A protein has these predicted regions:
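Catalytic core of non-heme Fe(II) oxygenases with the double-stranded beta-helix
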Residues: 70-203
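Non-heme Fe(II)/2-oxoglutarate
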Residues: 1-81, 113, 131-137
């Protein structure tokens, strides 16, 4: 996980928010709503920044303006999870650009990697069957509200995983991680109705 400071300036963030103020979402399934980032806006605000970041790049799917009403639990955005026919030889990265900020907006990224939901399920199963002396405890759930992400008991899956980092959403910054890395959102719903961000998946 890598945090990029000064990726956008605050005025650019305001322009993006204003652009989508009365915009209808093309996909709305209740938990979240998506729409593709307008191409003119992308060219104006993001293209050169991505060139600076990667020299050259290929986007797997369009950049997405996303509004989340509920936090995402532990998952990956791997290419094979989105499309089982895809190769994992070049997994690519995800770039998250927050359009809101606050102490309750956090993305937690772990070092463990999974290609699909089945591998995540197996990882949890292996964890449940571990002897007590093999269970790790990073105490991340004491710092970030992750109670929704996995049932809390005597042992906690979120605490057992190897922490890569916690990204507190801050306007103007961005964060990058490998697409097959496990990650989750903190529970912001006790304090906010929703949160907005731009997410882009790269080859």
């Amino acid at each position: 996980m890598k945090i990029i400071e000064n990726f956008l300036d605050v005025n650019e963030v305001k322009q993006i928010k204003e652009h989508y103020k009365n915009h209808s979402f093309t996909c709305n399934i209740g938990d979240y709503a998506n729409t593709e980032v307008d191409q003119k806006l992308f060219n104006k605000m993001l293209h050169e920044k991505f060139i600076t970041l990667f020299d050259s790049y290929k986007i797997t799917q369009a950049s997405i303006y996303q509004r989340c009403y509920l936090p995402f639990g532990i998952h990956t955005d791997s290419k094979t999870r989105m499309d089982p026919t895809r190769s994992v030889d070049t997994e690519g990265v995800a770039v998250l650009i927050p359009l809101d900020e606050g102490e309750h907006f956090n993305t937690v990224v772990w070092k463990e990697k999974c290609a699909n939901n089945e591998e995540i399920t197996q990882l949890i199963t292996d964890f449940v069957n571990l002897p007590n002396d093999k269970v790790q405890n990073s105490n991340i759930t004491e710092e970030v509200d992750l109670d929704f992400a996995w049932e809390k008991g005597e042992r906690n899956f979120c605490n057992h995983l190897t922490l890569d980092g916690v990204y507190n959403w801050k306007l103007g910054t961005a964060v990058i991680w490998e697409r097959n890395q496990l990650h989750a959102s903190s529970d912001f719903t006790k304090h906010h109705k929703y949160k907005d961000a731009i997410t882009t998946f790269f080859e």
